[in-house]
Amino acid sequence: PDVAKLANDLKTRQTKSLASGIDVIMADLKESMEAPPTSIDGHTNALVLLYENPRAPHFSEPGTDWIKNADAHRAGLLAAETAIVLANYLRLLGYPSRGHTITSSDVDLGRLAVAAGLATVEEGRLSHPYIGQRFGLAAVTTTFDFNPDRPLAPMRAQPAKAFGAAWRLGTRSVKNASNAVPFAKRRFVDGAHPFENLKRVETPTTYIDEPNVARVPKRTDMFARVQFGDMGKKLQDSARGGHYVRKAAPSMAQRRALGAFVLLQDGDTARKKTRLDPDTAAELVKATSYWLGIDAVGISRCPTWAWYSHDAKGAPIDPPHDQAINMIVDQGYETMEGSSGDDWIAVAQSMRAYLRFSLIGGVVAKQIRNLGYSAKAH
């Protein structure tokens, strides 16, 4: 039913966004939803994706009521994001491709995982040598030709050195025996970083003259100004249709998924409110966000001056929310250092962060709406 609702939204809803090229993206998505199903008979290869889950929440661990027994959903969601983006990427390069997820697949993901050397069958269940059974799967089938990996030998036939000193001490890999299980030594609510060691203050270090902060319309941000020609014709032409994104295949592949998430940023609120005390609510939001993969999350008030005065359509904004959940997605220092600023990495790393937040932020906002409170991902 949710897929049908999204298809109807693509036909009937008008997005309120000044994102460059959003009209092209939405038209493309609408056509995709209306297109008849196609066969994968010509697909000769598969790219299989394995997404590891953290440890299971402890029985009385604070903030974990929303995430208990939801590992399959978490891994399936994150794996689906990557599979859909990579399938789109390969299509942009000219190779017919399709993503297969835990909810919509034309292939047996378990069999593909064994064939691709990601898992073996141990006592009737799929298992990874280092991760065990804490994972979910997705795949991309394609005509793109690449060398396949070989299947793994059963666990009983694996050499002792695979789990020897190098694995225990981490001398040859970032992942090792001491950090193999995410959040093994941390509570989900605390996050992976030791934020509790940082000094906190009552107000921001920078003085903000709140009564006199001017609210400005969405039209004043740089992306909008470029599109409307405020920065000159050359930059306007470079932004037309989202050209600065479309010129690199990886970022354009992510942009299509981002377009679909625009329709999921907001939605109807449940009629019945679930009452939670503020401390419990904060713990639930933080633990869920970290469990889903956000790198840092903080909760703050959302003062009036933080809102634009007018939205993308020019309509006045009466600030609907007085609280905010702020999330950070790490783009990766090595990735940023490896980019010249004018290559396929530069835009793609930003789009990856936008996409990851749109996915996880959208999930958290939806959960809050399910509890009877208005919430929107930005």
Enumerate the language-model features and the residues they cover.
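Iron-sulfur (Fe-S) cluster-binding modules
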Residues: P1-S20, V24, I40-A46, A153-R301, ...
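Catalytic cores of enzyme domains
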Residues: D2-K161, K286, L292-H378
